[in-house]
Structures are given as structure tokens and as C-alpha cells.
Swiss-Prot record:
The chain crosses the membrane at residues 49-69, 109-129, 137-157, 173-193, 203-223, 232-252, 253-273. Key component of the proton channel; it plays a direct role in the translocation of protons across the membrane. Keywords: ATP synthesis, Cell membrane, CF(0), Hydrogen ion transport, Ion transport, Membrane, Transmembrane, Transmembrane helix, Transport. It comes from Nocardioides sp. (strain ATCC BAA-499 / JS614). It comes from the Bacteria. This is ATP synthase subunit a. CDD domains: ATP-synt_Fo_a_6. F-type ATPases have 2 components, CF(1) - the catalytic core - and CF(0) - the membrane proton channel. CF(1) has five subunits: alpha(3), beta(3), gamma(1), delta(1), epsilon(1). CF(0) has three main subunits: a(1), b(2) and c(9-12). The alpha and beta chains form an alternating ring which encloses part of the gamma chain. CF(1) is attached to CF(0) by a central stalk formed by the gamma and epsilon chains, while a peripheral stalk is formed by the delta and b chains. SUPFAM superfamilies: F1F0 ATP synthase subunit A. Its main location: membrane. It is a multi-pass membrane protein. It holds the Pfam family ATP-synt_A.
Length: 276
């Protein structure tokens, strides 16, 4: 949903209609497609704007980093310098420092994941797009499942299935009957719950931030255009809050991409760590 397309026009005397989850249910491009409900979410059988944004993000990132790496030189160009700086940031702070000596083979995934999430988050602040892709929960669950497969596969590859299951479910240094209580809890926490919390954290922040932006923008417009002049200062304040939240949202877009990849690195580190 863009701000231009989501301006709430209410019938005269009906009052202001605040934005809500329904504003994130975008129709299929071209219209005329069926929808169905699952897990409290509306799903469209067709191509939607967030789907196109995923493709656009992949194309933009490929073109940028291909151009940055195409003519590598000892004295880097500005584009190469920026590309290497981006790569070094993920490699060192999210790969080497978190995973340790086995980090190198996971850097391509962490690097791609970080900038893919960051750009899709940033779409919420880019004019004429103005919709963070991961404010739709289904998009985030796809990334979470991919991450779950990768760090579990890494652990099984190193320790074997039984050894990895023991590593994830049996706390080190604990013996006796209490294990009957701890093992199911560890299994739930480390195997089942992680992808859910990983997805919900990113989704909730992108959803809530965008909802606040819409609320301040449309609320301010309604106060200034539909209410008496004595409420004008409130409308102006709402728009000032919109500007402030917009800048805060840019910071959150970066932080949520960083946190998502940081947790991925931590999960991988735990999966490939030596046994207790």
C-alpha cells in the first residue's frame, strides 16, 4: 500500500477511519484473483506488489554488487570501495566475530540475507513504493524457514543427526531426572520456536512502524481538511510526528535487518559448535 493509494476518504459525517491490518492486504496486480484465509491472514492467488518487490530487490542487489566486483583493482573505484565495505561489514561483524573459525562458508548466505532484508525494509521509505515487503508475515516466514533449514543442516552435517539433536536438546553438565523436563523445553526452544520468533520479530516491527506512519499521515490530513481550524495545531503536530517516525523507521529498518542476520549467525554458531 502506498500513501497516495491508501488515503482514507470517508463519507461526509462518518468521521475518520483509522488504518488497520486490512490496509496491508494488497490486491493482486490486474485484479480479478481469488483470495483465501489461513492463520488469520488473507492470501491472494496472483502476483501482488510485495512479490514484485522481492524480485526487484534481487535484481537491484545483483546489478549493484556485480557492477562493484566486475572491474576489481588494487586501487578500488568508488563503487568497488563501497561494495567491499559492505561485504567486510557482514563478513567481519556478523560472520567471523559470531561464528568463529568455520565462518567463511556461511558468509555468502549472511551477506545476501542482510542486504536483501535491508532493501526490502527500505522500500517502506522509498517514494512511489512506500511498502515494506516484510510487513506481510508470509514473506518473513519464508526467510525464517530457509534460515531454519540452513543452520540445522549445518549442525547435522558436522555432528550427525543424533549428535546434533543431543547438542540442541541436552544441556551440558546436567544429569538426572530433571533432564526429562529440560529436554522437551530445549527441543521446543531450539528446534521449533526459533523460526517463529525470528519471523515475528521482523514482521511485527515492519508492520507496526508502517502502520504508525499511515496513522500520523492520514490523521493529520483529516484533522487539517475535515475538522475546524482550532484543531489545526493538532494536525500539524501529527505531520511533525510523521516526519519524526519516518526517520526512526529508517533506523529500525537497518536494525531489524542486522538483528535478523545476527540471530542467524548465532544459531549457526550454536549448530556447528563443539559438543558440550
Amino acid at each position: 500500500m502506498t500513501f497516495a493509494a491508501s488515503v482514507v476518504r470517508t463519507a461526509e459525517g462518518d468521521g475518520f477511519t483509522p488504518p488497520g491490518p486490512h490496509d496491508f492486504d494488497l490486491p493482486a496486480i490486474g485484479g480479478g484473483h481469488d483470495t483465501f484465509e489461513m492463520f488469520g491472514q488473507s492470501f491472494v492467488l496472483g502476483v501482488t506488489k510485495p512479490m514484485l518487490q522481492l524480485v526487484l530487490a534481487a535484481i537491484v542487489l545483483f546489478v549493484f554488487f556485480f557492477a562493484a566486483a566486475r572491474k576489481r583493482a588494487m586501487v578500488p573505484s568508488r563503487l568497488q570501495f563501497v561494495g567491499e565495505g559492505f561485504y567486510g561489514f557482514v563478513r567481519n561483524s556478523l560472520g567471523r566475530d559470531i561464528i568463529g573459525h568455520d565462518f567463511a562458508k556461511f558468509v555468502p548466505y549472511l551477506f545476501t540475507l542482510f542486504f536483501f532484508i535491508l532493501l526490502n525494509n527500505a522500500f517502506g521509505s522509498i517514494p512511489f513504493i512506500e511498502f515494506p515487503t516484510f510487513s506481510r508475515s508470509g514473506m518473513v516466514y519464508g526467510l525464517a524457514v530457509l534460515s531454519w533449514v540452513i543452520y540445522n543442516a549445518a549442525g547435522i552435517s558436522k555432528h550427525g543427526f543424533v549428535g546434533y539433536l543431543k547438542l540442541q536438546t541436552v544441556p551440558g553438565g546436567i544429569r538426572g531426572p530433571i533432564l526429562a523436563l529440560l529436554i522437551p523445553l530445549e527441543f521446543m526452544s531450539n528446534i521449533l520456536v526459533r523460526p517463529v520468533t525470528l519471523a515475528l520479530r521482523l514482521f511485527a516491527n515492519m508492520f507496526a512502524g508502517h502502520l504508525l506512519l499511515i496513522l500520523f499521515a492520514l490523521g493529520g490530513e483529516y484533522i487539517l481538511t475535515e475538522m475546524s481550524v482550532q484543531y489545526a495545531p493538532v494536525g500539524i503536530l501529527a505531520w511533525l510526528m510523521f516526519v519524526a517516525v519516518a526517520f526512526l523507521e529508517m533506523l529500525i529498518q537497518f536494525l531489524q535487518a542486522y538483528v535478523f542476520v545476527l540471530l542467524n549467525a548465532m544459531y549457526i554458531s550454536g549448530a556447528v559448535a563443539d559438543e558440550h
